[in-house]
Structure formats: C-alpha cells, structure tokens
A protein has these predicted regions:
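Charged, low-complexity C-terminal accessory regions
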Residues: 1-18, 28, 34, 40, ...
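Generic beta-sheet signal
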Residues: 8-10, 37, 85-91, 128-132
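Conserved P-loop
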Residues: 6-81
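Helix-adjacent hinge/juxtasegments
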Residues: 63-111
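Residue-level signal for inorganic ion chemistry
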Residues: 22, 57, 88, 135, ...
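SAM-dependent methyltransferases
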Residues: 1-5, 86-89, 114-119
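Short, basic/glycine-rich phosphate-binding loops at helix/coil junctions
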Residues: 4, 51, 55-58, 90-103, ...
C-alpha cells in the first residue's frame, strides 16, 4: 500500500466530534487501500462513568475493527503494525494521563517528555497509516494545581511534537473540521 500522507493528528475538545471524524477517516482509508482497520484504545474503565464513555465509543464505532488496548505501552503497540494497517489511536491525552498516574508522586516533565519522545519516534518511523486523536487542552485558563499544570503543559508539548511529525493536522470544533496542516491529501 502506498499513501503519501500516512500520519494524521486530530485535535479537539471534549465531545467535539474528533473521534467520529477520526473513525470516518480510518474507515475511508481502510477501504481505499484494502487495509486492516485497527483501533487502539488508551482508556481504562476505572469508574462507571468512564465505562459508559468507553461503551458509547464502542457502539458508535460499530463492527469491523481489530481492537487493541494500550493504556501505557502505546509506542510498543504501534511498533507492531505494518504497511497494510490503518491504525486509529484514541486518545493521546488519556494515555498521557495514564502515565501521569503511573508515575504518581515521581511524575515529572522529564519522565513524561521521555514517553512522548518515544511515541513520536515510533509514529514517525512506522510504515502504518496512523490516525491519532488528542484533546486540545490549552485553550482555557492556566490550572491552579501543580499536577493539573504538569498535565496541561505536557499535553500541549505532546500535541506540538506529534503535529510536527504528522502529514495532516485537523482541529475539530462543534463537529466541524478546521485543517491546521495539510499535505494536500486527507
């Protein structure tokens, strides 16, 4: 399979329509290239509300996906895909948050940046078509708590790093796509 643009970053706020947009793009690419469509989930159902969110995404997505879970070791999971795969990762900010809690009181910019750098390297080198979904969390006020600032700052840097490595970057607001970076193909 050959596709001149095989890395896409889809950004948006909560319930903005970013997952739906990314799912449609993944299905379209899978059909165009007769490729296997993979969904890599990063969320863990740690409470009832999160379990309901996960269920909502699963039912909205429908059949035909090879599903994988990677709440922490996302780079390792992505390195397993090849040129015949279309891979949708939903969502990077949940993944970053998982690492923040995994590190606990030892969480730091350096540790989170190391995980993001590892992920960005794998995304750049992967032969697979990868569609990444992430929350744009930097449009609000600066959070008051240290852990919240650590998360927001690192999420912003993560999105910048991955946007540099992706061929296309789209911001979804109110269900509408706004192209931020384009290689000419979506």
């Amino acid at each position: 399979m050959s596709c001149s643009t095989n890395k896409v970053l889809v950004l948006g706020g909560a319930r903005s329509g970013k997952s739906r947009f990314a799912e449609q793009l993944a299905r379209q690419r899978s059909q165009q290239h007769d490729a296997k469509c993979h969904y890599v989930a990063t969320a863990v159902p740690f409470d009832q509300e999160m379990a309901e969110r996960i269920y909502h995404h699963q039912t909205q997505r429908g059949q035909g996906w090879c599903e994988h879970e990677a709440p922490l070791y996302l780079a390792e999971r992505l390195s397993q895909f090849g040129a015949d795969d279309v891979v949708l990762v939903d969502c990077l900010t949940v993944w970053l948050n998982n690492w923040l809690f995994e590190f606990g009181e030892h969480a730091s910019n350096e540790k989170l940046e190391q995980k993001v750098a590892q992920l960005a390297s794998v995304v750049k080198e992967s032969p697979a078509q990868i569609i990444l979904v992430s929350n744009e969390v930097g449009l609000g006020v600066v959070p008051l708590g240290q852990i919240s600032r650590l998360f927001v700052d690192n999420a912003g840097r993560m999105n910048q790093s991955l946007a540099q490595r992706c061929d296309n970057v789209t911001l979804i607001a109110a269900g509408l796509p706004l192209v931020l970076k384009s290689s000419g193909h979506q």
